Amino acid sequence: MTNEEPKRTLVISTIENGTVIDHIKAGEALTVLRILGITGSTRECVSVATNVSSKAQEKKDVVKIEKRELKAQEVDRIALVAPNATINIIRNFRVIEKKGVIIPPVLIGVLRCPNPCCITNTNEPVMSRFEMHGKKAVCSYCDAVISSDISSHII
């Protein structure tokens, strides 16, 4: 008998091709799924692990999506709710690309302006445009500020 702690393993099946989103803030995996438009009727095989022990964070969430690689705009949206996330591209069971997410300084067509009178919320064909100032997003058209609950403004 030893004093060593038993080894703990995370058992989520590996994927052959697709994307693994790791180091999501604990409790945000379902928000990430919503951002990606993944619902119960989605055709992709999706694995979700929540509140998993982590060395880098106390707890984390992980999302694995078979046969799908994320678009840049999807990664930008994920960065808003999971700024420490890592995106792993998997091909033939191997990680071929691994990168952290970065919140871009300007977000176009990613957030909905909270100002109902903003030109982006009218019938005009204008995409929203926000500049990031720390954790605040400022509308480039009307100067409305989103400083909390940014995930509820993601388009």
Curated annotation (Swiss-Prot):
The keyword Zinc applies. InterPro entries: Asp_carbamoyltransf_reg_N, Asp_carbamoylTrfase_reg, Asp_carbamoyltrfase_reg_C, Asp_carbatrfase_reg_C_sf, Asp_carbatrfase_reg_N_sf. Keywords: Metal-binding, Pyrimidine biosynthesis, Zinc. The keyword Nucleotidyltransferase does not apply. One of its GO terms (biological process) is pyrimidine nucleotide biosynthetic process. Gene3D superfamilies: Aspartate carbamoyltransferase regulatory subunit, C-terminal domain, Aspartate carbamoyltransferase regulatory subunit, N-terminal domain. One of its GO terms (molecular function) is metal ion binding. GO terms for cellular component: aspartate carbamoyltransferase complex. Binds 1 zinc ion per subunit. Its cofactor is Zn(2+). Zn(2+) binds at residues 113, 118, 139, 142. It holds the Pfam family PyrI. Contains catalytic and regulatory chains. NCBIfam families: ATCase_reg (TIGR00240). Involved in allosteric regulation of aspartate carbamoyltransferase. Belongs to the PyrI family. HAMAP family: Asp_carb_tr_reg. This is Aspartate carbamoyltransferase regulatory chain. It comes from Methanospirillum hungatei JF-1 (strain ATCC 27890 / DSM 864 / NBRC 100397 / JF-1). The lineage of its organism: Archaea, Methanobacteriati, Methanobacteriota, Stenosarchaea group, Methanomicrobia. The gene is pyrI.
